[in-house]
Amino acid sequence: DYYWSQWNSEIMIKQFKEAVALQPDGIAIYGFPGDAAMRPIIKEAREMGIVITTMNTPLPDLEAELKTEGFGYAGADLFAAGFNLGKKAVEVCGLSAGDKAFVWGLASMPNRGERTKGAIAGVEEMGVEVVYQEIPDNVNSDASQGTPMYVATYSANPDIKMAITDHGGLTASLPTYMKAAGHGSEEVCGAGFDLSAPIVDGINSGYIDIVIDQQPFIQGYMPIVQLYLTTKFGMAGLAMDTGAAFVTKANI
């Protein structure tokens, strides 16, 4: 069974409880809600003999405690991925100290927010000023609703030279946002995460200049392998860093 949570932590918790009640052999989860919120449900699941593992966003405390019971992680080192993208994007976009960059992310979320914090730190280390906006719930679940917020941010800060969107859906929507703000493909440098077909189109069209590919297929595939290995052979949790490489128009 598969549950779609719209990237909403409260929905994830509700669906996780529902999944545990079905008593499957194993469950692969996202770590968006954080260790504290997920701990009681995971404890209940383990008492029922259900194997748990994570993908995309880690639960580092629980992973450390339950690794011998099959609790692994398939995903990027989030802070490092954000930090590396932030620095590389400044370089690729040709920004200088004192320039402004817009970072649109999820810094308030436990664990998941580390990627946004990393991106901000990477940009700031290069001497670039950050204008930050938190992605609201409605935009987090439906990137098409982000256009007014993007346009408003640029209206208030017309000297912003780069946008980093810490969200695959928002990164794919950068061309739409930029066109709505009246920007041509060479006016604002676009950066973000993941490598979907729309993002490839955005790179080829010039609206997206650099992304970091986190290999989401691997993030989804390996946790299922993990559950099989643990339920069948009792293997411990595996940790896989999927934050692979930067992608630009030069190597697409």
Language-model regions: role of each:
Residues 36, 41-80, 196-204, 208:
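Flexible loop/hinge segments that line or gate small-molecule binding clefts
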Residues 103, 123-126, 215-252:
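Hinge/cleft segment of the Venus flytrap/periplasmic-binding protein
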Residues 1, 26, 71-73, 99-108:
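Short beta-strand segments enriched in small/hydrophobic residues
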Residues 13-47, 119, 137-202:
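Hydrophobic alpha-helical
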Residues 1-6, 100-103, 122-143, 243:
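Short beta-strand elements in bilobed, periplasmic/extracellular small-molecule ligand-binding domains
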Residues 12, 72-99, 143-147, 194-199, ...:
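Hydrophobic alpha-helical segments within soluble ligand-binding/sensing domains
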